[in-house]
């Protein structure tokens, strides 16, 4: 019997990536072959994103393209999974009846059954990586208990559910056996890890246990400013293989807007938290995300945000314009700002951040730092420092002369120039072996 072949397109965030990797491992165990070209596949499976409007549009466009391939006889089946069917399954079934089946975010056994495979719980820790082999994501929880008024994630992903700590350690061991050296911890909210199962945070315990496993870099993404366990910052300071980096989306600083967003935090709370983090670990680099143009945001409130960003000097910052999300509570609010005005505010904030980032990056000039090589061409290596998460942060563009470098290896680099989003320099030597995480 010919082997069934599957082309999987994973859209959206790193949490989706992990879901796709789990599915591919289960499929491989059932002798379903994963292919990289659509024209080699029997089935196209699209893992969709529905977080913002642009993501929804991309998901729809990819579905239509897949259906074209089915009509042309290139593939036999098209399946769609993930966040978009979780919100719009009935509408999608009516509008796109040629799709063979739609699946939500918690239907892995049903997806496998449609592919002619059986879900095997003993393979939960197994993943076929879609990332480069030297880094991977470790999803430490599912769902979200926060009630942010602009967000539909709780409706898409359900209530917060921490993954068992020992299970995460087994999964991390599997990843290490596959050659992963950089582990990026992710969730909708890492701050609450363990609260639902033990009544207290287990994030620091998890970090310590992972640090003992001798990963070269361990990185924390998607912290929430409420309930964040500050002992984690002490561990970050004391353990050399835990990156001095924290991604903590703050969204805004104005108290009225924070209340309307239902963030559960004030500007004063936020300033105290950031100050405490920097006091405990002076080497920490902070990434955040801001949402501008929330319904009712005045020019004065936006300028307060500009002042806040200038004062706090975030190392990395992303910014999005507010858009009504159909299943989010804030969709009931009157949205008076034009798209053009929101985009102008995004540009203004990012222009300010450019100046901040340029200033902070100049501090690296003349210094040696550790980097990982993600890729290289001719005599230019594209690298990241411990302060840069994959895909979203800065790059280090480094020459390496006659050295024989390898993608996925770690090196010492001398920085001699910088811009807002890049560091420039040269690779000096390979990272010395045997560095202890203690």
UniProtKB/Swiss-Prot annotation:
Q: InterPro entries annotated for this entry?
A: Elp3/MiaA/NifB-like_rSAM, Methylthiotransferase, Methylthiotransferase_CS, Methylthiotransferase_N, Methylthiotransferase_N_sf, NA-bd_OB-fold, Ribosomal_uS12_MeSTrfase_RimO, rSAM
Q: Which cofactor does it need?
A: [4Fe-4S] cluster
Q: Which HAMAP family match?
A: MTTase_RimO
What are the GO BP annotations of this UniProt entry?
tRNA modification
* UniProtKB keywords: 4Fe-4S, Cytoplasm, Iron, Iron-sulfur, Metal-binding, S-adenosyl-L-methionine, Transferase
Q: Which SMART domains match?
A: Elp3 (SM00729)
Question: Pfam family of this protein, just one?
Answer: TRAM_2
Q: What does this protein do?
A: Catalyzes the methylthiolation of an aspartic acid residue of ribosomal protein uS12.
EC numbers for this chain: 2.8.4.4
Q: Which NCBIfam families match?
A: 30S ribosomal protein S12 methylthiotransferase RimO (TIGR01125), MiaB/RimO family radical SAM methylthiotransferase (TIGR00089)
Whichever gene encodes this chain, its name is rimO
Lineage summary:
Bacteria, Pseudomonadati, Chlorobiota, Chlorobiia, Chlorobiales
Q: Where is the TRAM domain?
A: 362-429
Keyword Aminoacyl-tRNA synthetase present in the record's keywords: the answer is no
Q: MTTase N-terminal domain location, by residue?
A: 4-120
GO MF terms here are: 4 iron, 4 sulfur cluster binding; aspartic acid methylthiotransferase activity; metal ion binding; protein methylthiotransferase activity
Using the record's annotation, list all stretches that form the Radical SAM core domain: 130-359
Q: Which family does it belong to?
A: Belongs to the methylthiotransferase family. RimO subfamily.
Name it. Ribosomal protein uS12 methylthiotransferase RimO
Protein residues bound to [4Fe-4S] cluster 2: 144, 148, 151
| Keyword Ribonucleoprotein found | no
Compartments in which it is found: Cytoplasm
Which reaction equations make up its catalytic activity? L-aspartate(89)-[ribosomal protein uS12]-hydrogen + (sulfur carrier)-SH + AH2 + 2 S-adenosyl-L-methionine = 3-methylsulfanyl-L-aspartate(89)-[ribosomal protein uS12]-hydrogen + (sulfur carrier)-H + 5'-deoxyadenosine + L-methionine + A + S-adenosyl-L-homocysteine + 2 H(+)
């Amino acid at each position: 019997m010919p082997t069934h072949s599957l082309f999987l397109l994973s859209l959206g965030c790193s949490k989706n990536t992990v879901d796709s990797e789990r599915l591919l491992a289960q499929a491989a165990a059932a002798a379903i072959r994963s292919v990289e070209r659509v024209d080699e596949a029997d089935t196209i499976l699209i893992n969709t994103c529905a977080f913002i409007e642009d993501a929804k549009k991309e998901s729809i466009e990819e579905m239509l393209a897949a259906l074209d391939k089915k009509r042309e006889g290139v593939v036999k089946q098209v399946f769609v999974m993930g966040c978009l069917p979780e919100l719009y399954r009935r509408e999608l079934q009516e509008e796109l009846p040629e799709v063979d089946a739609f699946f939500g975010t918690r239907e892995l056994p049903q997806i496998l059954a449609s592919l002619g495979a059986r879900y095997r719980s003993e393979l939960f820790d197994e993943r076929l990586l879609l990332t480069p082999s030297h880094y991977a994501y470790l999803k430490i929880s599912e769902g979200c208990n926060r009630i942010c008024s602009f967000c539909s994630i709780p409706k898409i992903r359900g209530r917060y559910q921490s993954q068992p700590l020992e299970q995460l350690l087994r999964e991390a061991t599997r990843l290490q056996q596959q050659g992963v050296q950089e582990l990026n911890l992710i969730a909708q909210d890492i701050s609450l890890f363990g609260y639902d199962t033990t009544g207290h945070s287990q994030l620091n315990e998890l970090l310590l246990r992972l640090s003992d496993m001798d990963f070269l870099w361990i990185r924390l993404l998607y912290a929430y400013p409420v309930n964040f366990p500050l002992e984690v910052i002490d561990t970050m300071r004391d353990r050399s293989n835990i990156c001095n980096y924290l991604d903590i989306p703050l969204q805004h600083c104005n108290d009225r807007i924070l209340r309307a967003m239902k963030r559960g935090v004030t500007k004063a709370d936020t300033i105290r938290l950031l100050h405490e983090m920097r006091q405990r670990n002076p080497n920490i680099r902070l990434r955040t995300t801001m949402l501008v143009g929330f319904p009712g945001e005045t020019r004065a409130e936006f300028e307060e945000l500009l002042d806040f960003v200038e004062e706090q000097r975030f190392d990395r910052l992303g910014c999005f314009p507010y858009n009504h999300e159909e299943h989010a509570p804030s969709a009931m609010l009157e949205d008076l700002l034009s798209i053009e005005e929101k985009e102008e505010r995004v540009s203004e904030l990012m222009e300010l951040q450019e100046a901040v980032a340029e200033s902070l990056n100049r501090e690296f000039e003349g210094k040696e730092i550790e980097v990982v090589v993600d890729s290289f061409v001719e005599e230019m290596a594209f690298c990241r420092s411990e302060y840069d998460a994959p895909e979203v942060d800065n790059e280090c563009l480094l020459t390496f002369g006659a050295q024989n470098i390898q993608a996925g290896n770690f090196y010492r680099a001398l920085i001699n120039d910088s811009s807002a989003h890049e560091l420039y320099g040269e690779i000096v030597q390979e990272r010395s072996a045997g560095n202890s995480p203690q």
